[in-house]
Design a protein with these regions (language model features):
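N-terminal, post-signal-peptide metal-ligating segments of extracellular/periplasmic oxidoreductases
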Residues: 2-135
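Hydrophobic or amphipathic alpha-helical targeting/insertion segments
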Residues: 11, 132-152
Length: 152
């Protein structure tokens, strides 16, 4: 990993489980039937250079697990979300759009960032409401493997 930072967009199993539990225990009926949702896509990888930007969107998809089709939330249609590779020292911009039915943020776990880009709801950032977007300015001073995940 020679001087590169891999910000892994693997919405780790715990996050996927959190999404699934949240969606499956909600008291209100689903707004869209599972059958009408797009199928979860294969995770893609993207390499960003210093100064580049990336569009990231959260929205519901369907995925079949052990023969049962369930509604899950995905980043850019995939579970886990996109793998984002960034060189150490690079500064990138992530334009996030919340196309879900819940308020959320993105937390770049373990990355040293300004509070305004940390994604901790009602502490460092307001929740991003359904249909709204937020632009994250991220810098990567440290080499490492990181992941990003939602906060509700």
């Amino acid at each position: 990993m020679k001087n590169s930072v891999k910000m892994i967009g693997l919405v780790v199993l715990a996050v996927v489980i959190t999404f699934f539990i949240y969606l499956s225990t909600r008291n209100q009926p689903a707004r869209v039937s599972v059958d009408a949702l797009p199928v979860a896509e294969e995770t893609q990888s993207v390499t960003l250079k210093d100064g580049e930007s990336f569009e990231l969107s959260a929205y519901p998809v369907k995925k079949t697990i052990n023969g049962q089709t369930v509604k899950m939330l995905a980043y850019n249609g995939s579970i886990p979300g996109p793998l984002i590779e960034v060189e150490q020292g690079a500064e990138v911009t992530v334009h996030f759009t919340n196309n879900t039915d819940i308020a959320t943020t993105i937390h770049p776990h373990g990355v040293r960032v300004e509070n305004a880009n940390d994604g901790v709801p009602d502490v460092t950032q307001a929740l991003i409401q359904p249909g709204q977007d937020f632009t994250y300015a991220l810098s990567f001073p440290d080499a490492g493997v990181y992941w990003y995940h939602p906060h509700f």
